[in-house]
C-alpha cells in the first residue's frame, strides 16, 4: 500500500472535491477488520472489486484485508514508466493501475494482501499505515528466521544479509481515495522468479528479487499467509486483536 511525493502511495488528487459528505467520515469507534480469502483470482477482478468497495464505503463500512494469489500478471503504477518492462512479448499481461510505485509482477506462489482501510476513521497518516504494513512483513519473515529491512526511498522489504543481501522479497503500493486505502502488498513465498527478469522491479534496473524458498524457508503459502494476517492485524489493531482473531478468519474458506 506518505505524502504525494512518496512512491509507496498514490493519493487521489480529486479526493477533496469528489468525496460525498458521507465518504469515510470518522465514527467514534474503530470497527473490526474482516479478513477475506479469495483463493486464486484474476488480477482484473480484484482491481475492479476493491475500487468498487472503496467507492461504496460509508462511515459504517468496516475495514477489510483480502488475501489472494494471482495468475501471472505485471502491474504498472499510475506514474510508472512502461520502459521498465524489458520484454514486451513475454506472454504475461500488463495491467496499468492507479497505485503508487512502478512495475511489479504477481504470480502463483506469491501472497498478495489488499488493505481496504479507512485512514480517517483510524486517524492514521498514510506514512504511518505504510510503516505498519512494512513492520508486519518484517515480523512475518522473522517468524521463519529471515532477517529483512526497509530501504530509504525504495518501497518494499529487502533481505538484510547473506548471499542475497539487498534482494527484494516483498513489494508495497497503495492508492488513497477519499481517505481510504486500497491495493496493498505482496510477499514472495515459493514461486517462479523468472518473470522478474523481464522487468526492472519497482523501477530499479538489476534489482535481484528472491522468495522465501530460495532463502531456505520451507513454510507453505497458506501457513505464511496466516502469519502475515496475524501480523497485519497486530500492527493495525494491537496484539490483543490479533490474538482474538476467530479461527474462521485464518481459514481459506470464507471467500
Swiss-Prot record:
EC number in record: 2.3.1.181
GO CC terms, sorted: cytoplasm
Single Gene Ontology BP annotation: protein modification process
InterPro entries: aa-tRNA-synth_II/BPL/LPL, BPL_LPL_catalytic, Octanoyltransferase, Octanoyltransferase_CS
PANTHER family hit by this protein: LIPOYLTRANSFERASE 2, MITOCHONDRIAL-RELATED (PTHR10993:SF7), OCTANOYLTRANSFERASE (PTHR10993)
Note: In the reaction, the free carboxyl group of octanoic acid is attached via an amide linkage to the epsilon-amino group of a specific lysine residue of lipoyl domains of lipoate-dependent enzymes.
Protein name: Octanoyltransferase
Gene that specifies this protein: lipB
